[in-house]
């Protein structure tokens, strides 16, 4: 019979039950955070160190310090968690990105304009200008410093394994361009993965091949004719563009009406 750390969640236990979560804190080592408070915030104890996991979104948080608030940290790292959203009394409409504001650098609103800034991009870096421009970045001309045309967020000191979209979402999770093109679920996933503690020596790197599916013609973006239509223009209501193309227009290409905002659509 295999041993199990006292207080660790039992196999098959329903951790969505508060009492079950509370029962995992038998050997909880953090004296300044009450187990009842942790359980009430959706977390159960994993039985190692001070690592906890949400029973609903699976985000894992560790390295708690005095002054930390489990509910606040839960909302910060996993804003789309269903448990967090229910506690906050969010409505389904909150899934839509905020009303579109003016881009910080409108001259770089198109991918082509951003790509042109990478003429002197350092050749030794793994990140290609094409993928950086696609992720919303333009090159500042200094070292490896890049900046988002929309949120004005800057990134530098790129590591070989840094993926532009993931880094953009991780450090600037409220960027309207990221939310419009990639969606809140992508941002949620990136933020969750960023705060999950992994043992680099024991956990293999898993690459999931990208799956490209042909999109029916009637679902294609009418601007680039390559990606799927995912954005609804407000107030006209036309659905004709993908996130990347929508970020670069201020009038609807169908009715030529002025746009108040562009909202990413979700399949339910």
Swiss-Prot record:
A GO BP entry: regulation of cell cycle
CDD domains named among the record's database cross-references: BIR, RING-HC_IAPs
EC number: 2.3.2.27
Family membership noted in the UniProt record: Belongs to the IAP family.
Keyword annotations of the record: Apoptosis, Host-virus interaction, Metal-binding, Modulation of host ubiquitin pathway by viral E3 ligase, Modulation of host ubiquitin pathway by virus, Repeat, Transferase, Ubl conjugation, Ubl conjugation pathway, Zinc, Zinc-finger
Zn finger (RING-type) location: 221-256
Protein known as: E3 ubiquitin-protein ligase IAP-3
Organism: Orgyia pseudotsugata multicapsid polyhedrosis virus (OpMNPV)
Lineage top rank: taxon: Viruses
Function: RING-finger E3 ubiquitin ligase required to prevent cellular apoptosis in infected cells. Ubiquitinates and subsequently targets host pro-apoptotic cellular proteins such as HID for degradation by the proteasome.
Protein residues bound to Zn(2+): 148, 151, 168, 175
Catalytic reactions of this protein: S-ubiquitinyl-[E2 ubiquitin-conjugating enzyme]-L-cysteine + [acceptor protein]-L-lysine = [E2 ubiquitin-conjugating enzyme]-L-cysteine + N(6)-ubiquitinyl-[acceptor protein]-L-lysine
Entry comment on modification after translation: Auto-ubiquitinated.
């Amino acid at each position: 019979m295999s041993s199990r750390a006292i207080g660790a969640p039992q196999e098959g236990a329903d951790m969505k039950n508060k009492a079950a979560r509370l029962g995992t804190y038998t050997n909880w080592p953090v004296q300044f955070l009450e187990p009842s408070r942790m359980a009430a915030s959706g977390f159960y104890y994993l039985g190692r160190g001070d690592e906890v996991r949400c029973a609903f979104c699976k985000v894992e948080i560790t390295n708690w310090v005095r002054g930390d608030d489990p509910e606040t940290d839960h909302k910060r790292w996993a804003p789309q968690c269903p448990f967090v959203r229910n506690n906050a009394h969010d409505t389904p409409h909150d899934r839509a990105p905020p009303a579109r504001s003016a881009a910080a650098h409108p001259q770089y609103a198109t991918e082509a304009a951003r790509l042109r800034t990478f003429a002197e991009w350092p050749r030794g870096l793994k990140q290609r200008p094409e993928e950086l421009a696609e992720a919303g970045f333009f090159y500042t001309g200094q070292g490896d410093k890049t900046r988002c045309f929309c949120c004005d967020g800057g990134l530098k000191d790129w590591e070989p394994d840094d993926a532009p979209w993931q880094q953009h979402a991780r450090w600037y999770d409220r960027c309207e361009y990221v939310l419009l093109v990639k969606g809140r679920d992508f941002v949620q996933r990136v933020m969750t993965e960023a705060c999950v503690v992994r043992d680099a020596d024991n956990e293999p790197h898993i690459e999931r091949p990208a799956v490209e599916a042909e999109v029916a013609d009637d679902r294609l973006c009418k601007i680039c004719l390559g990606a799927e239509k995912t954005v609804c223009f407000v107030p006209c209501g036309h659905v004709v563009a993908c996130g990347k193309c929508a970020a670069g227009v201020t009038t609807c290409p169908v009715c030529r009406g002025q746009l108040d905002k562009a909202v990413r659509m979700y399949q339910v």
